[in-house]
Regions:
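Enzymes that bind and transform nitrogen-containing heteroaromatic metabolites
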Residues: 1-200
Length: 200
């Protein structure tokens, strides 16, 4: 049976992005600090293991509009995502939005589909497109909260980074206890990576 996964870097005070996200600062103020563990080479052995989990191939992805780009309201211009002409997904990506948009097909097998009918519809479409190869909930925080509320996540990996952001996008606000069971813990000087099974 295919599994639904989610992998998020998080501050010690529970934020997955800093405040004031923008085109210039996609992760908000200081948000980049949450990702140094997999951006700064050479990687510690534990961080390399966690990055392998982050980049493992999946059959399809679900993400929020905020994850896809900084534009709010009706679509403007020809924005195609943060990742250039060949995004790292190599699979269909279903983007939650309140505004219609034609699919965007890019190199390497990534096509962004825009879904205005809510999380459950987007997840159902992603599951069908994945063809048994599993779905990943790619973020951001609001989309992960919806996925947890819907009970579809089987495995959640959290990369705890020893910083305090103070404000921004909290991951677990308003989320009922998902009954997380740790199954693997690895750590480096930059982060502690915990892989959880999610209860039902």
């Amino acid at each position: 049976m295919s599994e639904t996964t989610c992998h998020m870097s998080i501050s010690l005070d529970g934020f997955v992005a800093g405040p004031d996200q923008s085109l210039e600062q996609p992760l908000g103020r200081r948000g980049i600090e949450l990702h140094r563990w997999h951006l700064d080479e050479p990687l510690h052995e534990a961080d390399a293991r966690a990055r392998d989990l982050l980049l493992r191939p999946r059959g399809a992805y679900v993400m929020g509009r905020n994850m896809f780009g900084p534009i709010r309201g009706p679509w403007q211009g020809d924005w195609r995502g943060w990742w250039g002409d060949e995004p790292p997904y190599h699979a269909p990506v279903f983007v939650l939005t309140h505004f219609e948009h034609e699919p965007i097909e890019l190199a390497g097998g990534t096509t962004f589909y825009f879904v205005g009918d809510g999380f459950d519809v987007a997840f159902a479409r992603a599951s069908e497109a994945a063809g048994g190869r599993g779905v990943d909930i790619a973020g951001g925080a609001s989309t992960v909260r919806q996925a947890l509320a819907s009970g579809v996540i089987d495995e959640l990996v959290l990369d705890f980074v020893p910083v305090l952001l103070g404000s921004g996008e909290r991951l677990f606000d308003g989320v009922a206890d998902p009954r997380l069971e740790p199954v693997e813990v690895i750590h480096s000087p930059l982060a502690t990576h915990v892989r959880y099974r999610v209860g039902r």
